[in-house]
From Swiss-Prot:
Cystines in this chain: none
UniProt protein name: Proteasome subunit beta
Pathway recorded for this protein: Protein degradation; proteasomal Pup-dependent pathway
Oligomeric form and interacting partners: The 20S proteasome core is composed of 14 alpha and 14 beta subunits that assemble into four stacked heptameric rings, resulting in a barrel-shaped structure. The two inner rings, each composed of seven catalytic beta subunits, are sandwiched by two outer rings, each composed of seven alpha subunits. The catalytic chamber with the active sites is on the inside of the barrel. Has a gated structure, the ends of the cylinder being occluded by the N-termini of the alpha-subunits. Is capped by the proteasome-associated ATPase, ARC.
NCBIfam families: 20S_bact_beta
GO BP term, pick one: proteasomal protein catabolic process
Residue numbers covered by the propeptide annotation in the UniProt entry: 1-46
EC number: 3.4.25.1
Keywords in alphabetical order: Autocatalytic cleavage, Cytoplasm, Hydrolase, Protease, Proteasome, Threonine protease, Zymogen
GO CC annotations on file: cytoplasm; proteasome core complex, beta-subunit complex
Compartments it resides in: Cytoplasm
Active site: 47 (nucleophile)
Source organism of the structure: Paenarthrobacter aurescens (strain TC1)
Coiled coil: none
Amino acid sequence: MQDPSTGPLATQATSSFTEHLQRSRPELLPFNQLLPAGTVPSSPHATTIVALTYAGGVLMAGDRRATMGNIIASRHIEKVFPADEYSVLGIAGTAGLAIDITRLFQVELEHYEKIEGTLLSLVGKANRLGAMIRGNLPMAMQGMAVIPLFAGFDQVAGVGRLFSYDVTGGRYEELEHHSVGSGSVFARGALKKLWKPNLSEEDAISVAVEALYDAADDDSATGGPDPVRQLWPVVYTVNRSGNRRVPERDLAAVAGAIVESRAVAGREA
C-alpha cells in the first residue's frame, strides 16, 4: 500500500491555496483570464476607501456606492471585509474582480492556518495579497484593475499597521492614514487635517466618516451617508481583540453629528 505522505497529493501540498489552484485548476483563479481584443466591457467599479491608525489599532471604512460610467450601479455594495480575525481588506476598482480576489484571499489565509497550524504574520499576509494583485496585472492592463487597502493588528509589535498597493502588486506601508479610489484625493485632504496621533477609537470613526463625507461632496462616484435610505459607510476596527464591524446605529449618530456641526457653522457642505 502506498504511503500517503509520498503520494501525488502530498508532493503537490502547499500552504498557499492560490498556488494549489495555479497548479491544479488555473481556470478557477479570478485573475487568470485574458479578455478578447476590443472594447473593455462596462462593469461596476467600487470607489472610495479610507484607513487610519489610532491608539491601539487601525480602522478602515468604505462608502456604499458602485458606479458604471455615469450610472450608479449600486447604493448598497460593501467594499470593506474581514480578511481574518486580525486583519481587514478594502477594495477599489473593478468590483466583480475585487470581490473574487477578496474571497480568494480569505481562503488563502484560512488554508495557511490549517496547513501550518499557526497564523501568517501580518507582513506575510500583506505580501500574499500583493502577489495576487500582481497576478491580476494582465487584466489591469486591459482596464480592469483592482487596488486594495490592507490593515491589521500586528500581534508581535502590538500596533495597528496599514498597507497600500499599486496596480503591479507593489506593497507600501502607510504610517498614519491612506485612501484609495476615485474620491481618495478629497478624502486624503480631510484625513490630513483631521487625523492626529493617538486618536481614540470613537474619534477615529468620526474622522473616517467625515473623510468619506468630504469625498462624496466632490466626487460623484462616492456615496455619502444617506439618512433617507438609512445607508451608512461600512467601518471596521482592528485591535488586540480582533476585528469588529461598527454598528450602523453608531454610524448614524456619527454622521448626524457631522451634518449638525456643519449646519451650525453655516457651512455649505
